[in-house]
Amino acid sequence: MTSWPPRIVIRRSSGLRTMESALVRSGLGPVAGVDEAGRGACAGPLVVAACVLAPKPYPALARLDDSKKLTERTREELFPAITRLAVAWSVVSFPAEEVDRMGVHVANIEGMRRAVAGLSTTPGYVLTDGFRVPGLPAPSLPVIGGDAAAACIAAASVLAKVSRDRVMVAMDETHPGYGFAIHKGYNTPAHLTALEKLGPCPEHRRSWSNVAALIHRVDNSSGSAR
């Protein structure tokens, strides 16, 4: 009888495919990896991706790693390779307004559910990056630092990151002045300076403390001026 989660010896030094291979050998494949991009940003969408890779080596994906460790150019080069070679992949997005309404953690969990549900292949097991996701259609295991430990999570992290970055570059055209194409909505000094100067745009998350504080100051200033 298989225990849940199964007891597997994982040697991270053996490479990114070790975890999936162990699960597949235990009869638990196909294995899906899930990851997000934009959780900590104060502007733009939260994007979640799921990906299933076949349990075999892919020379075209040799550079696969945690998307945050890769250059933008490498991520862009890996993106079409992942979408071409993956058994299945799925990307879902929650706009800023929906993140505010749901809360970022709830949106993240729901995004992971939707991304897995959107796969064209039903996974036998799901690896998530960092925390438990209830309500998935298959047994799952949270993996701390999963995007650097499992290839399917690393692939999902690239899909989510590239998809979101492209949205932020386009957003820079519709909302100029904030530098979205550069900082991608994260709280960099340049972004915070632009936010103070221009005020929030519709793509800023009102539930974020720095955005909410700015709105509060503006409202108070407007009230005292009347």
UniProtKB/Swiss-Prot annotation:
Q: Sorted alphabetically, which InterPro entries does this protein's record hold?
A: RNase_HII, RNase_HII/HIII, RNase_HII/HIII_dom, RNaseH-like_sf, RNaseH_sf
What highest taxon heads this organism's lineage?
A: Bacteria
According to the record, how does the cofactor bind? Manganese or magnesium. Binds 1 divalent metal ion per monomer in the absence of substrate. May bind a second metal ion after substrate binding.
Location of the protein in the cell:
Cytoplasm
Its top-level enzyme class, in one word, is hydrolase
- Essential cofactor(s): Mn(2+); Mg(2+)
Signal sequence, renumbered to the chain: none
Q: Which reaction does this chain catalyze?
A: Endonucleolytic cleavage to 5'-phosphomonoester
Which E.C. number(s) belong to this protein?
3.1.26.4
Record domain RNase H type-2: where: 29-220
Q: Which UniProt keywords apply?
A: Cytoplasm, Endonuclease, Hydrolase, Manganese, Metal-binding, Nuclease
One term under GO cellular component: ribonuclease H2 complex
Q: Does the keyword Transmembrane apply?
A: no
The GO annotation for biological process reads: DNA replication, removal of RNA primer; mismatch repair
Q: Give me the residues that bind a divalent metal cation, please.
A: D35, E36, D129
Q: Which GO molecular function annotation, any one, does this entry have? A: manganese ion binding
The record's CDD domains line, in alphabetical order, gives: RNase_HII_bacteria_HII_like (cd07182)
Cited Pfam families: RNase_HII
* Main localization of the protein described in the UniProt heading: cytoplasm
What job does this protein perform? Endonuclease that specifically degrades the RNA of RNA-DNA hybrids.
Q: What NCBIfam families does the annotation carry?
A: PRK00015.1-3, PRK00015.2-2, PRK00015.2-4
Similarity comment text for this entry: Belongs to the RNase HII family.
Name recorded for this polypeptide: Ribonuclease HII
Source organism: Rhodococcus jostii (strain RHA1)
